[in-house]
Regions:
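A generic structural motif
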Residues: 18, 54-56, 81, 93
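Transition segment at domain starts
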Residues: 1-19
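Ligand-binding loop in jelly-roll beta-barrel domains
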Residues: 73-100
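Short, conserved beta-strand element in jelly-roll/cupin
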Residues: 38-53
């Protein structure tokens, strides 16, 4: 069954599911700024809207639009800004799993 996640007073919501051999979420973010932490390697694909990402140990913001993807390593914090409602898919990988998505991450 699906697990519903809600963060930042309901401004970020996701549904957790199994995507092949890995855990995944499909989610939405309302306009705003957020900070997330990872416990496993995460590959995020933007499916609607735009996300601006500030990676760990980086001073610059990187812009990602529809169908763009990016990777965040395990045990890191990263910042997200979205200028409007956005949607994403996030896949979670442990050390034994490789990224098998087709997004050139």
């Amino acid at each position: 069954m699906f697990k519903v996640n809600e963060y930042f007073e309901g401004k970020v919501k996701s549904l957790a599911f199994k995507d092949g051999n890995c855990d995944a979420t499909i989610g939405v973010m309302a306009k705003g700024e957020y900070e997330f932490g990872t416990s496993t390697k995460e590959v995020m694909i933007v499916i609607s809207g735009k996300l601006l990402i500030k990676f760990p140990n980086c001073d610059n913001w990187h812009e990602y639009s529809k169908y763009d993807c990016f990777t965040i390593e395990a045990n890191k914090k990263f910042q997200v800004k979205t200028p409007g409602d956005s949607a994403y898919i996030c896949r979670y990988y442990n050390d034994a799993q490789g990224c098998n998505c087709n997004c050139n991450c």
